[in-house]
Amino acid sequence: MSTHNNSPKEKPVDMNNISEKLDVVNNAPEKPAGANHIPEKSAEMTSSEWIAEYWKGINRGNDVPCCCPRKMTSVDKKFSVFGKGYLMRSMQKDD
C-alpha cells in the first residue's frame, strides 16, 4: 500500500479539462510585494512608447502580461529583434 497522500491541492492538473486549467490560473499566488508591474498604456502614450516601456520591464525581469511570470531569456531577446522586423514588414505590405 502506498504511503503517499495525494491531497486535493497536489493532484496533477488534467490539461484537457478547461475548468481545471482555469482553477490553476485563478488560484495563482499573488505577485510578491514590491514586484514591478508592466505599465498601463495611458492615452498620452503612443503604442511605440508603451512597447518600449514593456520591453524595458521584461528586460528587468518583470512579469510578462500572461499567467506565467518569468524572466526574459536570451531566446526572447533574439526573437524580439526578429519579431520587430516581422512586424515592420507586415505593416509595410499593401494588402
Curated annotation (Swiss-Prot):
Belongs to the asfivirus DP96R family. This is Uncharacterized protein DP96R. It comes from African swine fever virus (isolate Warthog/Namibia/Wart80/1980).
